[in-house]
């Protein structure tokens, strides 16, 4: 089976040392790599719990023989922007977040 994550390693082998530098183990490099995105952040209670869920997802990926790498995008909160000019950007920010995925 052709694994996209392994094909990408062939195209850009210089990324392996960078990943090891961020805490990956050498044996993780040969596994199926799954990116797990989260909006986890400490700025408001709506996203403060998401890191726990990300770790559960990563655990499931590892149990199936893969490696789950986490990455984060912004966690805009409508509740904090209400009553300010920031609320005008709420819908636009959701589109930007969707485009990051």
What is each of the regions a protein language model found here?
Residues 1-101:
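Metallocofactor- and cofactor-centric catalytic cores in central/energy metabolism, strongly enriched
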């Amino acid at each position: 089976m052709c694994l996209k994550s392994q094909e990408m390693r062939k195209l850009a082998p210089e990324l392996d040392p960078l990943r090891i530098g961020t805490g990956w183990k050498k044996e993780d490099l040969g596994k199926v790599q799954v990116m797990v995105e989260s909006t986890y952040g400490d700025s408001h209670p709506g996203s403060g719990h998401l890191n726990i869920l990300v770790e559960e997802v990563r655990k499931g990926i590892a149990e199936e023989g893969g490696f789950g790498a986490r990455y984060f995008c912004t966690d805009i909160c409508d509740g904090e922007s209400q009553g300010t000019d920031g609320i005008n950007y709420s819908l636009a920010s959701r589109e930007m977040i969707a485009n990051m995925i």
